[in-house]
Amino acid sequence: MLLEDILREVDGSPSSYTRASRLIGEGEFDQLAPVNVGVLSTFTFDLVSPFLVVESARRGMKVSPFFAPFNQLEQQVLDKGSALYQNDPGVVVIASRLEELAPPLIERFVSLGQEDVVTEIANVTERVGGLVQGIRQHSQATVLVFNFAPPSHLSAGLADTGLAMSQTSAVQQTNDQLARVCRSETGAFVFDYARLVTESGQRKWQDPKLWYLGRIPMGSNAQLKTGKSLSRYIRAARFPASKCLAVDLDNTL
């Protein structure tokens, strides 16, 4: 089956993406550049796989994703013999949330003093920075680091803007620190998950049923948008566009 035919049959439904992803994985398409993608996450992320595979194929890549065991970050990064490196990734995605990395910043923010908030931000920055550095010690893979979406519910509610250190500001400061970490490491980039969620809307992003079933913080439409956006980042990082300038020196063009 031709790739064009496979992609043409994708109608936007999760089932059509799943079928197309399977056919792409089983087929041989010379026009697609192979890319192994390793994913480290603190939440259930593998449902994004079919969307990532199909949207990457639209952009000329045959992505083979590997999803590390749930919430295993350091275990995969620091062990050079881990399944992550055995998969020989060209791209490593670190998909984490503050809910898992720094629960106090989300769950009990109003009980924290300003120094506590600064400490939590520093701890997250140090941990993610350590992951990026650890990957670089064992691999030359491109690293994409998810930044953090605003919390769906502010601990102080309407009073958040009146806090000396607001929860909104704390999340943004954490994202700023992640950006600094990525700037300091060659081949590391921020995946702007926060913007993706904000543009789509918090209430539309999550499906409570999926969260309670399997700690999946994204509904099916959010999974599609994440897979599509990730494919764009991977394409830009691994195969940057080239520009050609044609100069007419003898009036023959």
Where is each model-derived feature located?
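Short N-terminal or domain-adjacent regulatory/targeting segments
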Residues: 1-31
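Short hydrophobic segments within beta-strands
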Residues: 39-40, 146, 248
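Asp-based phosphoryl-transfer active-site loop
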Residues: 243-253
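Generic low-polarity alpha-helical segments
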Residues: 1-3, 37, 251
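Alpha-helical cap/lid subdomain in secreted, periplasmic
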Residues: 2, 25-35, 49-54, 58-221, ...
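Extended, charged helical/alpha-beta scaffold domains that provide interaction surfaces
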Residues: 38-45, 49
